[in-house]
Amino acid sequence: MKTIKYLSVCLTALLFGLMGMNATPIGAQTGKHDLTRRTWSDGFSSYTVRRGTGGLLLFEGGSLYEGGYAFALKPEGGDFYRLQPAPGRSDIPILGEPGNIVRLRPYGYEMYLVVYDEKSVPFYVLAPIKDLRKEIEADLTNYYLAGEYSDKEGRTITFFPSPIMTPQNRKVKGLTADGEAVRYTFGEEYHTPTNVVILPDGSAYLVKKTDDGLTVRKTTMKEDEWDKDGEVIIRNAQRTRYLSELDSLVPGDFPCAALQALTMGQLFRFSDEDLRMMRNEIYARRGLRFSKDGKIQKHFESKDWYHPEADDVSDRLTELDALNIAMIRRVEEMNKTLIPLLLLMGLQGKAPEPER
């Protein structure tokens, strides 16, 4: 057991060491700069890569529902690329404009493609994956559902986190008559896993999470969609405990933001309140003092890892910190205009609250 604990500590130190590295060329650090060896995803779609004429890198793929997506990256030397339409096309299916800089960056134990705007602010991430369906299921499990929730009557439902490598550990407690934890799978719409959990007995439940809380209702498939008006099992249950598969590596409610670059597909799984707290938790890790007697300050004062030290921690933020803050802000802004679509998809709630 001591050996396992020692290895865990070493791994954590290694991860933070990698995240603290400055912008040296990726090839010099790892030698793994061949984009064609990986499949890349924003959490909604995935792309394989092949080499075109003149060294152009062609990204081709799509969602689980439809294909035919394509764009290209033009190598600019080192870990720099330029975003452009694929040959014969005028559109780009990812967030970005022709000419945007794209860089291959190391964060934690992985490498990511990051798109930057004209002011060099990052706003889009492509992560390396192996299987899009499994990635979407893992994102739903760990970012949309994971946690313990209780309503005013005291009923509690717990969704347990599960690594992508062990989907058999994906369990929920509180939906069966005996109250035991049981495995679940996801229902699908348009060939894509969605926020419907299916238990071993075949019963299905639609799970909707907003800033008002978690609501679970029975559901059945009607034509091509899951019924959204079934019997309510629990309504507006409040999260009483955060659960994460990364809890053992980093303290906090959102350790994912300290260990990896987050994609839009992952960030859209969180409620607006979660996004706000996640963003502020990044600052809190670096010792930021928040508004005295404010909600944010009181929240972090309850955490034993929080040590407020400065009113400005901008010089303490790592490249990964800055990236995830920028990505969270981008999704918060997008939520202001995408609310009707996101409500239809059952993914999000209200617009972000003002700054702390």
Placement of each model-derived feature along the sequence:
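Bacterial N-terminal signal peptides that target proteins for export
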Residues: 1-11
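Bacterial N-terminal signal peptides
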Residues: 10-20
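Sec-dependent signal peptide cleavage junction
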Residues: 22-37, 135-143, 243-258, 340, ...
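Tryptophan-anchored aromatic micro-motifs
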Residues: 26-54, 60, 126-156
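Amphipathic alpha-helical packing elements
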Residues: 267-307
